[in-house]
């Protein structure tokens, strides 16, 4: 049994990706986790994977975690507050202000409710995709409100810390505005770009490289879930999209008249603003430090990537990030390795000396 902070029995409502992942992580800590879901099959799967046990009518949880779709979160939280009058209830939905408003309309006892949101997930859902380490090192927002005391809410922070996540305190409105910017609008932009590929020629799609893969990576997300999320956070998302639209309109105007005075500067300014924005995204350990990249060509045969990573370690270089790319039909792959700038030149020299081919290196 692992050391843990949380000293309460936990009830998880919703045996999907997040609920099952929470159950897996808490069960590994020795917490008694009971699982409930409208789908008996989902509960059985989650139990089989080790996320807890089926809930019973005799359970007296101290903490209830609601992990259901956003459009039924408030009603489910209200039901759990009524059914377990001694329990603290939280949810992990990706929007917060609307849920709190609905709970107040329903007359729920929000003195025992505190909404949270783990900034973690996967493109695929369901209990079979769950992982006990899903939350490690990830921000987990605690969306506070005036109706609950911090002493009562302490168990929420214990839960987050036990799951290896990093607690971040925000108001419900701050949370919704923040996730509109860093999650909801990027999802829409990725989806809109990917939709253009449906009408692209086979020849164009065959040229797909890492750029289009990066932009469209999250476009395979569940449409039904995202309709709920976007509808629940519509105003902040629409406000940001209007500013994106203004930028796109400026780019269109400049490209339609590329020789007009100021057109090239408009494009350059947009690109520069993008550089400034991406530089603000925290990297490893929350640092905004920029890294150097070198692209290593790897034969598409078993064991080559493992050999490269082993040799980088033997050279005493700490790899900050890694991205892989394959070209259709090619028998070679490309590993883009990120390192601190001062390590770039020595690493290129050392890998070249060991027979590795570095793209762009002479």
Protein language model regions, located:
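NAD(P)+-binding Rossmann beta1-loop-alpha1 motif at the extreme N-terminus of oxidoreductases
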Residues: 1-55, 63
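Phosphate-coordination loops involved in phosphoryl transfer and adenosine-cofactor binding
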Residues: 6-9, 61, 86, 137
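Short beta->alpha hinge that forms the Motif I/post-I loop of the SAM-binding pocket
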Residues: 38, 68, 92-94
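N-terminal Rossmann-like NAD(P) cofactor-binding module of classical short-chain dehydrogenase/reductase
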Residues: 64-65, 90
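Rossmann-like NAD(P)(H) cofactor-binding subdomain of soluble oxidoreductases
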Residues: 76-127
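Internal alpha-helical scaffold of NAD(P)-dependent oxidoreductase catalytic cores
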Residues: 134-220
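Interdomain hinge/lid region at the active-site interface
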Residues: 203-274
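A conserved regulatory-domain signal marking ACT and ACT-like small-molecule sensing domains
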Residues: 277-362
């Amino acid at each position: 049994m692992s050391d843990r902070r949380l000293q309460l029995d936990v009830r998880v409502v919703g045996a999907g990706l997040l609920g099952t992942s929470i159950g897996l992580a808490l069960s590994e800590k020795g917490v008694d986790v009971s699982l409930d879901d409208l789908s008996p099959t989902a509960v059985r799967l989650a139990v089989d994977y080790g996320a807890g046990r089926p809930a019973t009518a005799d359970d007296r949880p101290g903490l209830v975690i609601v992990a259901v779709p956003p459009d039924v979160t408030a009603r489910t939280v209200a039901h759990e507050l009524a059914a377990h009058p001694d329990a603290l209830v939280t949810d992990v939905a990706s929007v917060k202000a609307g849920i709190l408003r609905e709970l107040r309309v329903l007359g729920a006892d929000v003195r025992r409710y505190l909404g949270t949101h783990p900034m973690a997930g996967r493109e695929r859902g369901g209990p079979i995709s769950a992982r006990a380490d899903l939350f490690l090192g990830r921000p987990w927002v605690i969306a506070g409100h005036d109706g609950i005391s911090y002493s009562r809410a302490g168990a929420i922070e214990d839960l987050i810390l036990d799951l290896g996540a990093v607690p971040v305190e925000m108001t419900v409105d701050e949370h919704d505005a923040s996730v509109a910017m860093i999650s909801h609008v990027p999802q829409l932009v990725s989806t809109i770009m990917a939709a253009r590929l449906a009408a692209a020629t086979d020849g164009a799609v065959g040229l797909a490289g890492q750029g289009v893969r990066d932009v469209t990576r999250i476009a395979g997300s569940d449409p039904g879930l995202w309709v709920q999320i976007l509808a629940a956070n519509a105003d902040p998302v629409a406000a940001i999209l209007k500013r994106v639209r203004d930028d796109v309109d400026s780019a269109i105007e400049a490209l339609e008249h590329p020789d007009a005075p100021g057109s090239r500067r408009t494009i350059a300014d947009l690109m520069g603003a993008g550089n400034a924005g991406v530089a603000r995204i925290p990297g490893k350990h929350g640092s905004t430090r920029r890294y150097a990249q070198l692209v290593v060509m790897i034969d598409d045969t078993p064991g080559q990537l493992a050999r490269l990573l082993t040799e980088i370690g033997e050279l005493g270089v700490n790899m900050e990030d890694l991205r892989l790319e394959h070209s259709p039909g090619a028998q070679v792959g490309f590993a883009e390795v990120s390192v601190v700038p001062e390590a770039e030149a020595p690493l290129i020299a050392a890998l070249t000396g060991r027979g590795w081919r570095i793209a762009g290196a002479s």
